[in-house]
Design a protein with these regions (language model features):
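Polytopic transmembrane helical bundles with strong interfacial aromatic enrichment
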Residues: 1-140
Length: 140
């Protein structure tokens, strides 16, 4: 479930990034995928609290690391806007408002595209980790 939802988000996000298109559906799917990661972590915690453990300790690394990946990806997403502003030598987001309308749209499109790429990549990493977790989930 975790791998499937995040794979769908990664594919849609990658496609939209490639085509330089915004996608409300991607963000919704990404958030659902992130929610599935949280739900999976809660299930793992509940099983551990109940005394049921995987015989392979790598399982816990692969199963819980997606939470950290999501956090780091969100930080990179936040930083992506500042990177674009720095590239254009703009001091802050308000300075974009002083640009001609066409340039404003270009800056916003670059920021959205970078954010989309970062988050689609993070979803792809989560897919890999979820599949590895599934492969190491022994002994429950």
């Amino acid at each position: 479930m975790v791998a499937g939802l995040n794979a769908a988000a990664a594919l849609l996000g990658g496609w939209r990034w490639y085509r330089c298109e915004e996608s409300g559906a991607f963000w919704l799917l990404l958030r659902v995928g992130q929610g599935s990661v949280l739900a999976f972590a809660l299930v793992i915690g509940s099983l551990a609290a109940a005394g049921k453990y995987s015989s392979d300790n790598l399982f816990y690394l692969y199963a819980l690391l997606p939470l950290a990946i999501g956090f780091v990806a969100e930080q990179l997403r936040v930083g992506s806007a500042q990177t674009i502003l720095d590239q254009r030598e703009l001091p802050d987001a308000q300075a974009v408002g002083g640009l001609p309308e066409k340039e404003q749209r270009t800056v916003v499109a670059e920021i959205v595209r970078r954010e989309l790429g970062v988050m689609a990549t993070s979803a792809l990493v989560v897919v890999f980790l979820a599949l590895r977790a599934a492969g190491t989930a022994h002994g429950f």
